[in-house]
C-alpha cells in the first residue's frame, strides 16, 4: 500500500514539474477565410493565404511580442512546489546543524576519530539483526568528518 502511495506521489510530482503553459498570445492568429471549395483548395495548395510559421509551446526563442507581465501568467505549480521543497530542505539542514554541532564539539574535545565513531556504530548494530551500518549512521559519520575538516582537525578524520 505504501508503494502505491509513493508511485502516485512521484507521478503527480513528475507531471506537475514537467509541464509549462505558453502565454495565450504567443501564437499569431491565422487569417480566416470563408469556407468554400475554392478557398479549401487554395489552403491545400498553400497558395492564396499568407501562412506564418506557428510557434510550438516549447520553442520560446522565436516568440515575439512578449510583454514583461506575460511570463507571470503561466502556470508554474511545479516550480512553486520545487522552490517550496528546497526552502524546507534548507530550513531542515540549518536546524539539523544547530542540533548536531554541540555533540560534534564534545566529540572533537575528546579527540574521537572518524574510524572510532564508525566502529562504535558497528558495535551498536551487532545484535540488532541488521547486516550493515544504516544510512543514517553513515550520514552522521560523514557530517562529523566534514565538521572536523571545517575546524582544521584533519588528524581526527582517519
From Swiss-Prot:
Q: Does the keyword Ribosomal protein apply?
A: no
Q: Where is the signal peptide?
A: 1-21
Q: Which InterPro entries match?
A: RXLR
Please report which protein family the annotation says this sequence is part of.
Answer: Belongs to the RxLR effector family.
Protein origin, superkingdom = Eukaryota
Designated name of the protein: Secreted RxLR effector protein 2
One annotated Gene Ontology cellular component of this protein: extracellular region
